[in-house]
């Protein structure tokens, strides 16, 4: 079990807790959120952060397998031109490396759940090993 505290804790179940305490089990699942009324007392093993603790973020629209194409497709060509460019310049190996980088960036920025639009199975293995929970939405071109 671990305990965390911060200047403010946002639980999404009421107002922020001033110097509250979050208790998690060993895998990080929240067991409880304690309202100390702002009167936090020192405790052995309590990890205090001089900031805020917030719930994880949800990214509801992502294209992991296209991460390697950032900045490579010009705008203003319409949907048909966009799809043509995607199909003609994508490289599966480069895309896998870029998708792994994007997955790590998302996690480091606080994303815990992601809806990923995909055209192939190129990112499926990455998603099974990620610390982010993914929902894959298949787009058929």
Language-model-derived ranges and their functions:
Residues 18-19, 72-75, 129-131:
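Short, glycine/charged-enriched secondary-structure capping and boundary segments
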Residues 9, 63, 119:
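Catalytic metal-binding/acid-base residues of hydrolase active sites
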Residues 90-141:
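Active-site loop-helix segments enriched in His/Asp/Glu that coordinate
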Residues 11-13, 37, 48, 104, ...:
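Short, flexible, glycine/charge-rich loop motifs used to bind or transfer phosphoryl groups or to couple energy/partner
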Residues 29, 44-45, 133:
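Conserved beta-strand segments of alpha/beta enzyme cores
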Residues 1-41:
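N-terminal metal-binding scaffold of metallo-dependent hydrolase/deaminase domains
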Residues 66-98, 135-138:
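Active-site gating loops and adjacent loop-to-helix segments of metal-dependent hydrolytic enzymes
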């Amino acid at each position: 079990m671990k305990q965390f505290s911060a200047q403010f804790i946002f639980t999404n179940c009421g107002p922020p807790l001033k110097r509250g305490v979050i208790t998690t089990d060993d895998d990080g699942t929240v067991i409880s959120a304690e309202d100390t009324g702002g009167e936090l007392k020192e405790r052995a093993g309590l990890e205090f952060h001089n900031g805020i603790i917030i719930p994880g973020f949800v990214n509801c629209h992502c294209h992991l397998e296209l991460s390697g194409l950032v900045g490579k497709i010009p705008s203003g060509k319409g949907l048909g031109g966009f799809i043509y460019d995607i199909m003609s310049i994508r490289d599966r190996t480069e895309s896998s490396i870029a998708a792994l980088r994007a997955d790590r960036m998302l996690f480091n920025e606080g994303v815990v759940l992601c809806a990923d639009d995909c055209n192939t199975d190129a990112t499926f293995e990455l998603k099974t090993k990620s610390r982010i929970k993914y929902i894959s939405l298949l787009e058929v071109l």
